[in-house]
Design a protein with these regions (language model features):
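N-terminal, active-site-proximal structural segment of metallo-dependent hydrolase catalytic domains
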Residues: 1-101, 159, 193, 214, ...
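Beta-strand-turn-beta hairpins that frame and shape the catalytic cleft
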Residues: 1-5, 107-112, 131-135, 139-175, ...
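Active-site metal-binding loops of divalent metal-dependent hydrolases
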Residues: 10, 41, 166, 222-224
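A Trp-anchored, charged/polar loop motif used as the substrate-binding/catalytic surface
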Residues: 20, 129-150, 189-206
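Short, flexible/disordered intra-domain loops and linkers
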Residues: 45-59, 90, 174-179, 230-241
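Extracytoplasmic mature domains of secreted/periplasmic and thylakoid-lumen proteins
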Residues: 79-138
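Metal-dependent phosphoester-hydrolase catalytic domains
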Residues: 108-115, 139, 201-218, 224-335
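A solvent-exposed, charged loop/short amphipathic helix patch at secondary-structure junctions
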Residues: 169-193
Length: 335
């Protein structure tokens, strides 16, 4: 049975901005997937379910301006807040937007697993990872969202999704807890290295759940990095990241020991952002990343962007009413 997994940066989507955005079109896009990760969902995710208010009429209005009212009851959803006050994180500034992630999934296809205490394991922010300061790594500006999803027809198979929005610009020095002697491009690449080397490998290796026999792990989101094959300019994300048994990134695909190696592939070469000043595509920032087991076992075809710009009436209208990013899709098949 095939399943469609999506990633979509919805560009500062908030409950307050609902009047200026085409929620019907955004909901129609979401319906093309079985499960989707959203980036740049603001204001505590109120746009998902509606803003909680006391009076009945206010509740009705809030519901009308939500994605829930357009998706229906066969969707579950969860908003995640990556903000932290920990002293170990480099960014100490104040993001007044309140940017977060969201997972939305069809309840007739997926469910959250249950732990040994009988409690549902809902998506969460993933913070349990290590960084290598000798390689310029730090804690991420935004820790990723992490969701475990079991298939209803294959309860022992599990899809593990790690959604990310890699930092675009280096924060100003007054908003950093430590001095950084590299620029924004290197910071983006370092963040990807943390995601691949530390977070992906740890989540992929976790077989400690009695209810999970086969986990397939996928990073998805807005990397703010291009694949060179896309034709977009640098900074680049490597098409293949090779990691040894000590979780060190190797320089080339051929410089590795015989055992304990991760080959992690980053896919999706279509341009997926719209140019700020003209009506055309700009960058190839949105990707999926997964290991060879996942690629050879369940992936069907090449990931791609959805052709939604024409549906919206052109670049300008899409950019104003929907987003400056195009949703991307990965199709998998499990039997």
């Amino acid at each position: 049975m095939s399943y469609k997994i999506g990633s979509f940066n919805v560009r500062n989507l908030s409950f307050g901005a609902a009047a200026s955005r085409d929620l019907d079109m955004i909901a129609d896009i979401i319906k093309e997937f079985d499960i989707i990760a959203l980036q740049e969902v603001l204001s505590e995710g109120k746009i998902l379910e509606g803003s909680p208010v006391k009076d009945v009429s206010g509740q009705a209005i809030a519901y009308e301006h939500s994605l829930r009212s357009r998706l229906g009851s066969n969707w579950d959803m969860c908003w995640l807040d990556p903000k932290t006050e920990s002293k170990w994180y480099p960014y100490i500034g104040n993001d007044s937007r309140g940017e977060g992630f969201a997972f939305l999934w069809r309840t007739d296809k997926f469910k959250c697993p249950v732990n040994e205490k009988g409690k549902e394991v809902r998506p969460r922010i993933y913070r349990q990872y290590r960084t290598d300061s000798s390689k310029g790594e730090m804690k991420l500006i935004r820790d990723p969202g992490y969701g475990r999803f079991q298939l209803l027809n294959l309860p022992n198979a599990e899809i593990r999704l790690i959604t990310t929005h890699i930092v675009f610009g280096k924060p100003s020095e007054e908003n950093l807890s430590k001095e950084i002697d590299f620029g924004a491009y290197t910071m983006r690449q370092n963040e990807f290295n943390v995601l691949a080397r530390s977070i992906y490998t740890s989540i992929s290796d976790d077989y400690n759940d009695v209810n999970c026999v086969v986990p397939y792990t996928i990073i998805l989101g807005d990397y703010n990095l291009n694949l060179q094959e896309s034709g977009a300019v640098s900074p680049y994300v490597p098409a293949v990241t090779v990691i040894d048994s000590q979780k060190r990134i190797l320089e080339t695909e051929f410089d590795y020991p015989d055992k304990g190696v991760y080959f992690i592939h980053t896919k999706q070469t279509n341009l997926s952002t719209i140019n700020k000043d003209s009506d055309n595509y700009a960058n190839n920032y949105d990707h999926f990343t997964y290991d060879r087991k996942t690629e050879f076992s369940i992936v069907r075809g090449a990931p791609c962007r959805l052709n939604v710009v024409e549906r919206a009436g052109g670049y300008k209208n899409y950019k104003e009413k929907v987003s400056d990013h195009i949703p991307i899709m990965l199709e998998i098949d499990l039997k």
